[in-house]
Amino acid sequence: MKAHVYVTLKQTVLDPQGQAIHGALRKMQYQGIEDVRQGKYFVIRLSDSLDAAAAKAEIERIANDVLTNPVIEEFTFRLEE
């Protein structure tokens, strides 16, 4: 089983890298781009012995304890068989 974990800054936190990318896209005349937020992406391979509920709990614990700074970041994830 794999977990795909996406970590982003909270909407209330300024994202200077996202703003820089947005500015570059505008200068390059890309159309229809309203906002850019940058983040991190992790793929975590889990033991096949974990059921879906245990895998979900483990990923939530890992994301909260290791992958994010909960003051400024949030995460989402999806599990893949």
Task: Describe the residue ranges of each PLM region.
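Solvent-exposed beta-strand sheet faces enriched in polar/charged residues
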Residues: 6, 36, 45, 78-80
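Non-catalytic surface loops within mature trypsin-like serine protease
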Residues: 9-11, 48, 81
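Short, charge-patterned binding micro-sites
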Residues: 38-51
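Short, conserved charged micro-motifs
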Residues: 14-16, 50-57
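C-terminal structural segments of small proteins and small subunits
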Residues: 53-81
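Short amphipathic alpha-helix segments
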Residues: 12-30
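N-terminal glycine-rich anion-binding loops that anchor highly charged ligand groups
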Residues: 31-37
